[in-house]
């Protein structure tokens, strides 16, 4: 099983020691402390994936292993479809650019990534430069795909995103929210179930896919209704749908893949 035990992590990063405590005979880290979470995830990325990534103090701190498993599941589907050197678009790469970096590091792909927050764009570019990888970062200016000048006339084998998924009535800014301290734009997907932004990716993305291209979205377990709506939308635009499950610790995530025939 892919992972990094706490006792091993502190051997690689001594900064973690101040966040470690014992519960029974096991070492624990208080991951509610954002600085502890940042240091641990930086260590995981370096030790397991040889990536040197900095995290923005005001941004969402992604879980590296479930992002990797998300990518792995998606690229297994691409391989089954006979796509070996895909052109990839990530929607909403965030300040870490972790999904795009993992794709570029481990797969033979041409990678484009969008982000709306200008501060996060600068941060993502620094992470990309630090790892000496070629990823094209684009300011989406609040758009999903359509209307982004840099994407005009482009086609992709994969459009991938872990989109914002909280409902329009949720309040995200300035507080701990759903286990995350992050900016509103990273969390609020809109719609009754948080499905609205995912709908945009699907409705617009279908026109930017090559034949056999895939739209791959990751979603949490609850609410089930959100997943049902996203699957229904994929089918409405003519995509064949596959759903995989991945689990890291107690977190269950669903990978919803829409395939263009």
Curated annotation (Swiss-Prot):
Swiss-Prot/TrEMBL keywords: Methyltransferase, Transferase
PANTHER family the record matches: RNA N6-ADENOSINE-METHYLTRANSFERASE METTL16, SAM-DEPENDENT METHYLTRANSFERASE
Gene Ontology BP annotations: rRNA base methylation
Protein name per Swiss-Prot or TrEMBL: Putative methyltransferase MJ0046
CDD domains linked to this entry: AdoMet_MTases
Xref: Gene3D superfamilies: Vaccinia Virus protein VP39
Family annotation (SUPFAM superfamilies): S-adenosyl-L-methionine-dependent methyltransferases
Gene Ontology molecular function, alphabetical: 23S rRNA (adenine(1618)-N(6))-methyltransferase activity
Similarity-based family: Belongs to the methyltransferase superfamily.
Signal peptide: none
Chain segments annotated as transmembrane: none
């Amino acid at each position: 099983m892919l992972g990094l035990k706490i006792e091993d992590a502190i051997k690689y990063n001594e900064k973690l020691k101040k966040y470690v405590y014992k519960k029974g005979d096991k070492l624990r880290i208080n991951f509610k402390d954002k600085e502890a979470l940042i240091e641990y995830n930086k260590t995981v990325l370096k030790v397991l994936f040889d990536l040197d990534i900095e995290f923005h103090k005001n941004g969402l701190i992604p879980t590296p292993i479930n992002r990797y498993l998300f990518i792995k599941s998606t690229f297994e589907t691409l391989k089954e479809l006979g796509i070996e050197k895909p052109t990839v678009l990530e929607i909403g790469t965030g300040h870490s650019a972790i999904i795009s970096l993992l794709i570029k590091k481990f797969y033979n792909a041409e990678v484009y990534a969008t982000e709306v927050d200008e501060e996060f764009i600068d941060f993502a570019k620094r992470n990309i430069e630090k790892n000496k990888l070629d990823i094209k970062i684009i300011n989406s200016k609040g758009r999903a795909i359509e209307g982004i000048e840099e994407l005009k006339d482009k086609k992709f084998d994969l459009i991938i995103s872990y989109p914002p998924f909280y409902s329009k009535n949720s309040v995200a800014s300035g507080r701990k929210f759903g286990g995350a301290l992050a900016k509103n734009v990273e969390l609020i997907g809109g719609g009754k179930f948080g499905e609205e932004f995912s709908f945009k990716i699907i409705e617009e993305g279908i026109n930017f896919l090559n034949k056999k291209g895939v739209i791959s979205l990751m979603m949490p377990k609850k609410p089930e209704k959100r997943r049902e709506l996203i699957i229904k939308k994929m089918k409405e635009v003519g995509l064949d749908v596959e759903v995989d499950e991945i689990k890291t610790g107690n977190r269950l995530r669903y990978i919803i893949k829409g395939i263009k025939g």
